[in-house]
């Protein structure tokens, strides 16, 4: 819910290191805000999306590329692709709409990246090292604490190792942004049923029942 972007829709792929923000390629989509980390993206209510993070392929990754098991096929390079500095790895974020939702054709124009089921590269983020550890998911909702409630469900979290082994995540530990850091006290994380199985549900403008540090399992 980013007011600087068309329809308040945006996707952010950025990160931090010890000395500040991580660098990366330019976004593969326009950015009305001019923020290198955030590009315009017309999310549609009720449409499931797959977020994939994997090494960029070929000469755009400093380390050996992981096997492409389960990774969307996208162009190796795009209009803004660039190789990372020595010692860094290019981590590519890709979003793929999985099905049509109840408002398909209303919130997105024909030909826009969220109207088709084609994978859409967001950008490459450059980080030191060549492994991903301690993954997390979160919902960055740029809305007032008393705004209309928003719900985001994260389901089917899966990691694929370099040998193609599939590891399905079953549990996560809850955390919230503190009020002192700009967060709200009325956000909540719970477990709900989604179309493809149990999911972690992130809710805003609601009563908080799950305390920080609580482990939430998707299946017992």
Task: Show where each model-derived region lies.
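Secretory/extracellular carbohydrate-interaction modules
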Residues: 1-23, 38
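Short intrinsically disordered, low-complexity coil segments enriched in acidic
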Residues: 1-5, 28, 90-93
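Ligand-recognition surfaces built from glycine- and aromatic
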Residues: 1-8, 111-112, 118-220
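Ordered hydrophobic segments in well-structured contexts
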Residues: 10-14, 36, 50-52, 90-94, ...
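A structural detector for beta-sheet-dominated domains
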Residues: 14-16, 44, 96, 192-194, ...
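Short loop/turn segments at secondary-structure transitions that flank enzyme active sites
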Residues: 17-19, 57, 99, 143
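Short, aromatic/His-centered strand-loop micro-motif at the edge of beta-sheets
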Residues: 27-48
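Carbohydrate-binding surfaces in secreted/extracellular proteins
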Residues: 43-106
């Amino acid at each position: 819910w980013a007011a600087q972007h068309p329809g308040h829709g945006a996707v952010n792929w950025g990160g931090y290191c010890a000395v500040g923000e991580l660098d990366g390629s330019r976004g593969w989509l326009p950015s009305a805000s001019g923020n290198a980390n955030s590009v315009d993206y017309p999310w549609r209510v009720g449409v499931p999306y797959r977020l994939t993070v994997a090494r960029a392929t070929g000469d755009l990754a400093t380390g050996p590329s992981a096997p492409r098991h389960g990774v969307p096929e996208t162009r190796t390079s795009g209009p803004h692709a660039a190789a990372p500095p020595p010692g860094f790895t290019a981590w590519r974020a890709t979003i793929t709409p999985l099905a049509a939702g109840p408002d398909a054709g209303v919130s997105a124009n024909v030909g826009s990246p969220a109207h088709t089921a084609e994978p859409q590269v967001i950008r490459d983020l450059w980080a030191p090292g060549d492994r991903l550890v301690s993954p997390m998911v979160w919902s960055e909702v740029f809305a007032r604490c008393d705004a209309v409630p928003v719900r985001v469900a994260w389901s089917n979290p899966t990691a694929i190792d370099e040998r193609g082994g599939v590891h399905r995540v079953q549990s996560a530990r809850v955390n919230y942004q503190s009020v002192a850091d700009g967060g709200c006290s009325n956000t909540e994380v719970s477990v709900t049923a989604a179309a493809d199985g149990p999911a972690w549900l992130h809710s805003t403008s609601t009563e908080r029942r799950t305390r920080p540090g609580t482990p939430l399992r998707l299946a017992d």
